[in-house]
Curated annotation (Swiss-Prot):
This is Vesicle-trafficking protein SEC22c. Residues 8-119 form the Longin domain. It is a multi-pass membrane protein. The keyword Transmembrane applies. Ubiquitously expressed.
């Protein structure tokens, strides 16, 4: 008999769903409990490692350790020890499959959707294998629950009403890498190549001048900085084009200003055409950065 209906793995710090079982239950009551689970996932950091919320037909159980939590929607006939044994098994399987770095860097929902096959396998095992075959594991969990009972949540703790959770506006935590940019264009690739070339020229001239100045005099510090500052600005322009960054316009203007001022300062060491080339590449890169927009957010993969 099926007593575990749905399971998912989420990141504790922001409630980002990492993987979930593909469910085939679409009753109104079940969908309501899915919404409750999603609401609760956003606030797991507020609760201890284990907790349960029970209703008439369904119950939610969660178990977390570190930055990974496993959550399940079960029938009310499902013993708590079995639910937490299932969640602990799932937690071990997930953390054995993915390291903490991958989990921490995940930026989109269901980044580890392929783990669904493991969830289904473990879920089937707990739903259809007799409890006598899991006696050892269940006894261990039962002892732990006696020593440290799980937090008991009310249905109000999982409610979502008009987009407000318990009278508080939900925080939508979304790390910067979660922003996905539009595909790179041919002109954008050209601007990257030219920018890297300008950065290399600035670095080579700056290092060469620094070596010469150390042997001769310390009067060339201004010229050295005028080469190295635009070098850093060119590299940062490449970063701004490839990745999203907050306050992008302000950073673009600042980098463009550094490059223009640096090249104007080098008027005695570069001819007019060289200066115009460097400034022209900087303007092209700035234009490409500002015209490359964010992609529209994708839906939650239909899980």
């Amino acid at each position: 008999m099926s007593v575990i209906f749905f399971a998912c793995v989420v990141r504790v710090r922001d409630g980002l769903p990492l993987s979930a079982s593909t469910d085939f239950y679409h009753t109104q009551d079940f969908l309501e409990w899915r919404r409750r689970l999603k609401s609760l996932a956003l606030r797991l950091a507020q609760y201890p490692g284990r907790g349960s919320a029970e209703g008439c037909d369904f119950s939610i159980h969660f178990s977390s350790f570190g930055d990974v939590a496993c959550m399940a929607i079960c029938s009310c006939q499902c013993p708590a020890a079995m639910a937490f044994c299932f969640l602990e098994t799932l937690w071990w399987e997930f953390t054995a499959s993915y390291d903490t770095t991958c989990i921490g860097l995940a930026s989109r929902p269901y980044a580890f959707l392929e783990f669904d096959s493991i969830i289904q396998k473990v879920k089937w095992h707990f739903n259809y294998v007799s409890s006598s075959q899991m006696e050892c594991s269940l006894e261990k969990i039962q002892e732990e629950l006696k020593l440290q009972p799980p937090a008991v949540l009310t249905l109000e703790d999982t409610d979502v009403a008009n987009g407000v959770m318990n009278g508080h506006t939900p925080m939508h935590l979304e790390p910067a890498p979660n922003f996905r940019m539009e595909p790179v264009t041919a002109l954008g690739i050209l601007s990257l190549i030219l920018n890297i070339m300008c950065a290399a020229l600035n670095l080579i001239r700056g290092v060469h001048l620094a070596e010469h100045s150390l042997q001769v005099a310390h009067e060339e510090i201004g010229n050295i900085l005028a080469f190295l500052v635009p070098f850093v600005a060119c590299i940062f322009q490449c970063y701004l084009y490839l990745f999203y960054s907050p306050a992008r316009t302000m950073k673009v203007v600042l980098m463009l200003l550094f490059i223009c001022l640096g090249n104007m300062y080098l008027h005695g060491l570069r001819n007019l055409w060289q200066i115009l080339f460097h400034i022209g590449v900087a303007f092209l890169s700035s234009y490409q950065i500002l015209t490359r927009q964010l992609q529209e957010k994708q839906s939650d993969c239909g899980v």
